């Protein structure tokens, strides 16, 4: 009788553990700790950031309304998002105020600029919030604003022959997510099959926290065909200011060379000018 009860107890515990594991939200214990911050200027450091490595030089480059070239803005591309850089190439994403298309502006290692236009496909949002280039440089992921269940995949301008200047940059594939994400402002590759993303989600209903740092584990490295991704919320991003109110999470950058993750968070109210920050995080 006691042995039978013990067996039933073990089985019940195993079943309960399995149920709890399957029912648990896509939210993991914090694994990234804040190690410091730098002031972020609202004019030219408020949208995104990346590190460009060319030869022996290292450039920390930011985007903001003040970094949009006048001729680009004059043609209707009035918003720049979070950029990325691989193998000396640099790509920054643009959207138009009239919602009529997207553009990716690429700079070669030699410094030459080329524009790659993308016509919206059926059901595609006009937002062009960020770009994230695969570590091998072949493919580029991008994102839409709002509550989404997918990421967009393109051939990387300058690095993939399928991206042709002067022709439409094709939507090559999508990444179907197993959990909705909201207001993602930037992503960067942590590895060939994992991304870290900064979400400006003000609601908190998706993961139980607002402004989360997300991790997306891909089923495989992007190869031009549709694939899936598993979403996990890691922690709330740092929110600290002398002012109270709504923060705005912006772009993100991860550097494997020193393991540093950087995320821009703009402060509320008038403090946006004084104490907006680029936060530095490392795995704890």
Where are the model-predicted features located?
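Structural motif
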Residues: 67, 98-106, 147-157, 203-219, ...
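Blade-loop segments of beta-propeller domains
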Residues: 64-101, 115-121
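Loop/turn-rich, solvent-exposed surfaces of beta-rich toroidal or solenoidal domains
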Residues: 179-230
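Conserved beta-strand position repeated once per blade in WD40 beta-propeller domains
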Residues: 46-51, 80-82, 128-130, 184-186, ...
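Secretory targeting and sorting signals
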Residues: 1-28
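Beta-strand-rich domains and repeat architectures in extracellular enzymes and scaffolds
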Residues: 36-64, 78-82
């Amino acid at each position: 009788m006691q042995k039978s009860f013990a067996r039933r107890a073990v089985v019940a515990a195993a079943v309960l553990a399995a149920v709890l594991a399957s029912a648990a939200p896509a939210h993991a214990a914090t694994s990234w700790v804040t190690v410091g911050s730098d002031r972020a200027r609202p004019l030219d450091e408020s949208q995104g950031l990346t590190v460009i490595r060319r030869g022996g030089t290292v450039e920390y480059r930011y985007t903001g309304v003040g970094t949009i070239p006048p001729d680009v803005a004059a043609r209707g591309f009035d918003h720049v998002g979070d950029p990325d850089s691989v193998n000396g190439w640099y790509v920054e994403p643009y959207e138009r105020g009239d919602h009529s298309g997207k553009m990716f502006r690429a700079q070669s290692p030699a410094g030459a600029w080329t524009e790659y236009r993308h016509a919206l496909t059926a059901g595609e949002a006009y937002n062009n919030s960020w770009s994230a280039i695969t570590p091998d440089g072949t493919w580029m992921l991008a994102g839409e604003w709002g509550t989404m269940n997918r990421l967009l995949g393109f051939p990387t301008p300058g690095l993939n022959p399928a991206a042709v200047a002067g022709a439409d940059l094709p939507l090559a594939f999508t990444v179907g997510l197993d959990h909705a994400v909201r207001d993602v402002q930037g992503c960067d590759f942590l590895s060939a099959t994992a991304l870290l993303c900064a979400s400006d989600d003000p609601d908190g209903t998706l993961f139980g926290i607002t402004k989360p740092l997300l991790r997306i584990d891909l089923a495989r490295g992007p190869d031009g065909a549709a694939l899936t991704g598993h979403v996990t919320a890691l922690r709330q991003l740092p929110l600290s200011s002398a002012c109270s109110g709504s923060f705005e999470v912006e772009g993100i950058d991860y550097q494997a060379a020193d393991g540093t993750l950087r995320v821009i968070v703009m402060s509320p109210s008038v403090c946006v000018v004084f104490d907006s920050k680029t936060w530095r995080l490392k795995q704890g």
